[in-house]
Amino acid sequence: MLDREGYRPNVGIILTNNRDEVFWGKRVREHSWQFPQGGIKPGESPETAMYRELYEEVGLLSQHVKIVGRTRDWLRYDVPNNWVRREWRGSYRGQKQIWYLLRLTGRDCDVNLRATRHPEFDGWRWHQYWAPVDEVIDFKRDVYLGALKELSSRFLRGMESYEDFAARQLSGNR
């Protein structure tokens, strides 16, 4: 299901622990890492899609997390043509996403990457809040950074800004 502009509605999930570290999933049989995300089905609300994707990709249920916040608007990224299925070329531009910031209220052992028959991830780790941005595939990077910035400034009081984090990394003070 695409909107008029060629974007597929989607949700992204930034799952944090009590140390404000983020869940980082390793894609099955790949060396790439990302946040959980997935499409919104027709008739499904973004929140319902978020809980479905959270279970399908991470094995967590609503009782394992608390919604801290979500982005105000859709964040969009274009997918390069060489990444688009041949049958979609010409109509598909990319994804538009509502991002959710969640707090894990359960335990690490509640994570189950094999909750469904078609796992998205075969590994996971907790990561510093800002650190994953540089590891994201380049065409998604601005959306990831935009979501992390908006959600941290609105909902994570006292969180170091991305600019301060980046300056610290450049100076070698990790």
From Swiss-Prot:
MF terms (GO), sorted A to Z: pyrophosphatase activity
* Family matches, as InterPro entries: Nudix_hydrolase (IPR020476), NUDIX_hydrolase-like_dom_sf (IPR015797), NUDIX_hydrolase_CS (IPR020084), NUDIX_hydrolase_dom (IPR000086), RppH (IPR022927)
Gene3D superfamilies found in the cross-reference section: Nucleoside Triphosphate Pyrophosphohydrolase (3.90.79.10)
Cofactor requirements of the protein: a divalent metal cation
Pfam families (UniProt xref): NUDIX
Could you say which EC number(s) this protein's record lists? 3.6.1.-
- Whether Lipid metabolism counts among this entry's keywords is no
Q: Which domain of life is it from?
A: Bacteria
Q: Give every Nudix hydrolase domain span.
A: 6-149
Write out the residue ranges of the motif Nudix box: 38-59
Which key words tag this protein in UniProt? Answer: Hydrolase
- Role noted for this protein: Accelerates the degradation of transcripts by removing pyrophosphate from the 5'-end of triphosphorylated RNA, leading to a more labile monophosphorylated state that can stimulate subsequent ribonuclease cleavage.
Family affiliation: Belongs to the Nudix hydrolase family. RppH subfamily.
Q: What is this protein called?
A: RNA pyrophosphohydrolase
Gene of this entry:
rppH
